[in-house]
Swiss-Prot record:
Record-level Gene Ontology MF annotations: ATP binding; glycerol kinase activity; rhamnulokinase activity
Short name of any one Pfam family annotated for the protein: FGGY_N
Task of the protein: Involved in the catabolism of L-rhamnose (6-deoxy-L-mannose). Catalyzes the transfer of the gamma-phosphate group from ATP to the 1-hydroxyl group of L-rhamnulose to yield L-rhamnulose 1-phosphate.
Keywords: ATP-binding, Disulfide bond, Kinase, Magnesium, Nucleotide-binding, Rhamnose metabolism, Transferase
Residue numbers binding substrate: 87, 242-244, 302
Source taxon at top rank: Bacteria
Annotated gene: rhaB
HAMAP family: Rhamnulokinase
Protein name: Rhamnulokinase
Similarity remark: Belongs to the rhamnulokinase family.
Protein species of origin: Enterococcus faecalis (strain ATCC 700802 / V583)
Cofactor annotation: Mg(2+)
């Protein structure tokens, strides 16, 4: 293809999170840089139906079609599309290939006792040794453990959320491997479905379609199936469809002295490596080995993240923006309370404000009352948690290299207070941005698939030259604060 034709290739990243989704358009310029532009944004969320919290897949499909229609109206007649979403949730198809019912959201309470009950018949240590994935009650394996047997019996196929959307648009059913690793059903060594786990669940392997790697050409958008929409000609590419996998691919890390935090509803803190770390210590610390693009491993810890402040803002009826909450927090004294940000009680409480206050009351601490105090409590403790986990990361992997740079990407990278706190508490340089790392990772994987970019290092160089980042140098805090925090965490775990 001629150079001028390559420059005009249009790529679309469909990036859907728990609360919103968007379609981002990108092209690669002659100077090697890439552009990125939001074309369509829409709300997402789960709703109560038939006793469960569910995702509205029909609404998501409709919004994506509206966005693609906007793309066509911009004069773009041909494009490539990649889809990423959150992990672990799944759609069940009936014998005719239609959705059995709306998929149940991972925050639904149905799996509250799943880990305990599962462990009565299957060792959690063995589960970790087989899969390398941290034990979390909402993982696909535990959702399937509590799934209604009648629904499973009626299902012909199981598709993860991005794969279902790809199936709707192309008619091709696959499961993308990086996202499949979050199911906790794949063997870390063989990279195939673990038959012993499937037997324990009473599930046949035929329920799962073919596993494919990121960069696989899925197929063309079946425009004839959507006559009510004026759509462009599009080719779907299966990218690293778990949003964290795309975010890390979209992180501008060079060399081997860096770690990352993909900062959004969850904070995913880890390193990129090529080997799994499956040990008794990693199991105890609940670290995970999720698969990444091009044979990489994301060894990371899931931390509750911006969910805490999102829920505080929601229960204040969004009286304050996130920037305003951070500004209020900055005026408050630091480290007045210690909390375990990963305590399960914060996963989906009725009211995050009262839950945080109850936690502080129960642990005989000063109770945060004002919006600024609540925000300060959250940001201080996220920074403390990040710092402790960075140390554990080095210990668990036995890495000789010193982590000198922490790349913070995603929406949370815009939080200047938290970035500086993290640099200070962890005593590392924080490199914040790009905020659009998920969409960028999605887009760049497409460009690798089409041959516009050679590999992941080339993609990251492209990010560095295209998007500025903000550097936060460390002003180390009094070490006794961190010592007190760690002592508190040790007591609270007893």
């Amino acid at each position: 293809m001629k150079k001028e034709q390559v420059e005009k290739r249009t790529y679309l990243a469909v990036d859907i999170g728990a609360s919103s989704g968007r379609i981002m358009k990108s092209q690669r310029l002659a100077n090697g840089q890439i552009t990125i532009e939001e074309i369509h944004r829409f709300k997402n969320g789960f709703h109560q139906k038939d006793g469960y919290q569910r995702w509205d897949m029909a609404s998501l499909v409709h919004e994506l079609l509206l966005g693609l229609q906007k793309v066509k109206q911009l004069g773009i007649k041909e494009c490539f599309i990649g889809i990423d979403t959150w992990g672990v949730d799944y759609c069940l198809l009936d014998q005719s290939g239609q959705l059995l019912d709306e998929p149940i959201a991972y925050r639904d309470g149905r799996t509250e006792a799943a880990v305990t009950n599962f462990s009565k018949g299957y060792s959690l240590e063995k589960l970790y040794q087989q899969t390398g994935i941290q034990v979390q009650p909402f993982n696909t394996i535990f959702q399937l453990f509590v799934e209604e047997k009648e629904r499973l019996a009626a299902a012909s196929q199981l598709l993860l959320i991005p794969d279902y959307l790809g199936y709707v648009f192309t008619g091709k059913a696959v499961i993308e491997a990086t996202n499949a690793s979050t199911t906790q059903l794949l063997n870390a060594g063989t990279k195939q479905w673990e038959s012993e786990l499937l037997d324990f669940l009473g599930i046949d392997e035929t329920l799962f379609p073919t596993l494919v790697e990121p960069g696989t050409i899925l197929g063309d958008l079946q425009t004839a199936a959507f006559p009510d929409y004026d759509l462009p000609n599009a080719t779907l590419i299966t990218i690293a469809s778990h949003d964290t996998a795309s975010a890390i691919l979209g992180t501008p890390g060079i060399g081997d002295d860096w770690a990352y935090i993909s900062s959004g509803t969850w904070s995913l803190l880890g390193i990129e490596t090529t080997v799994t770390t499956i040990s008794a210590e990693a199991f105890q610390e609940n670290y995970t080995n999720e698969w990444g693009a091009q044979n990489t491993i994301r060894f990371l810890k899931n931390i509750m993240g911006m969910w805490l402040i999102q829920e505080v803002a929601r229960h204040q009826n969004y009286q304050y923006s996130y920037a305003e909450l951070a500004a209020l927090a900055e005026k408050e004294p630091a480290f007045q309370q210690f909390i375990d940000v990963n305590d399960p009680r914060f996963l989906n409480p009725g009211n995050m404000i009262t839950e945080l206050q109850a936690y502080c009351r129960e642990t005989q601490q000063t109770v945060p009352e004002s919006p600024g105090e609540l925000a300060r409590c959250i940001y201080d403790n996220l920074a403390l948690c990040y710092s402790v986990e960075l140390e554990k990361l080095a210990q668990l992997t036995g890495i000789e290299r010193k982590i000198t740079t922490l790349h913070v990407v995603g929406g949370g990278s815009n939080n200047r207070l938290l970035n500086q706190l993290t640099a200070d508490v962890a005593n590392v340089t924080v490199n914040a941005g790009p905020g659009e790392a998920i969409a960028l990772g999605n887009l760049l994987m497409q460009m690798i698939a089409t041959g516009e970019l050679k590999d992941i290092p080339a993609a990251r160089t492209c990010i560095q030259t295209s998007f500025p980042t903000e550097i936060y140098q460390a002003n180390p805090i009094d070490s006794t604060i961190k010592n007190r925090y760690q002592a508190f965490m040790k007591r609270s775990s007893l």
